[in-house]
A protein has these predicted regions:
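Conserved ABC transporter NBD signature motif
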Residues: 56-64, 76, 109-114, 216
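ABC-type ATPase nucleotide-binding domains, specifically the catalytic core motifs of the NBD
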Residues: 12, 68, 93-111, 120-122, ...
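Conserved ABC ATPase signature
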Residues: 131-135
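Conserved catalytic motifs of ABC-family nucleotide-binding domains
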Residues: 152
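ABC ATPase C-loop
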Residues: 148-149
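Helix-to-loop junction immediately C-terminal to a conserved catalytic motif
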Residues: 48
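The feature captures the beta-strand-to-loop junction immediately N-terminal to the Walker
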Residues: 33-35
């Protein structure tokens, strides 16, 4: 279980997040939604160890993540797929995937992990020898997610995976993401595409100006006036 409690964080003296609390249960897909600049990506950086909060706690099971290095957090099984994909464009698809399996948890199961991600994203097996930089945007996003899965995550942090993709590709990728919980992977999804994120998750959190202003079951949040008015219409 991942638990963020009363976390405040920011840059210099300007808070980006203010007293944020959320919880991700085992085998759950939850989403954090909101407009650009609301603080969603900062939350991901805090959980991944790229930033430290000024106050509050971040716990994974019984372990505090605050003060741990990003590599140690990876070893615990928390893997981030960052916004913008951040692939190695001159390396092949297979080489990019192999980089995801470098931690101690993943190395012994590299072969099985290749089989798994190729089953989830067959196009990546077809393009295994192709340079990552020559893939389409949708294929690059599939590769970024697959590289994260190569690390054998217990928790997968997905930061804005729908950016720049067509609605058809978004639906395809989100369907795969929603199915990861059946493999024992918890998913925390950060998204501006509120409709798609709520459709694939069981719980959601709406962030506005650094604060969580709404939370609950995704099916209930869809009917909230603030969600309808600001993000999905109605």
């Amino acid at each position: 279980m991942l638990k963020v409690e009363n976390v405040t964080a920011g840059y210099l003296q300007s808070p980006v997040l203010r007293e944020v609390s959320l919880q991700l249960e085992d085998n759950e897909c939850a989403c954090v939604v909101g407009a650009n600049g609301a603080g969603k990506s900062t939350l991901m950086s805090l959980i991944s160890g790229l930033m430290r909060p000024s106050s509050g706690s971040i716990m994974f099971n019984e372990t505090s993540l605050i003060g741990l290095s990003p590599s140690k957090i990876v070893d615990l099984g928390i893997i981030q797929v960052p916004e913008g994909r951040r692939l190695f464009p001159r390396m092949t698809v297979a080489e990019n995937l192999l980089l995801g399996a470098r931690n101690a948890r993943a190395r012994p199961e590299t072969k099985a992990s290749f089989e798994k991600v190729y089953h989830l994203f067959p196009i990546l097996e077809e393009r295994g020898k192709q340079k990552a930089g020559t893939l389409s945007g949708g294929q690059q996003q599939m590769l970024a997610i697959a590289r994260g899965l190569m690390a054998k995550p217990k928790v997968l942090l997905l930061d804005e995976p729908s950016i720049g993709l067509s609605p058809i590709l978004v639906a395809e990728i989100f369907k795969t993401v929603g199915g990861l919980v059946n493999d024992g992977i918890s998913v925390l999804l950060v998204e501006q595409n509120v409709r798609a994120a709520l459709a694939v998750s069981s719980h959601g959190f709406l962030v506005e100006r650094g604060r969580i202003v709404l939370s609950g079951k995704s099916q209930d949040l869809v009917e909230e006036s603030a969600i309808k008015r600001g993000f999905i219409g109605g």
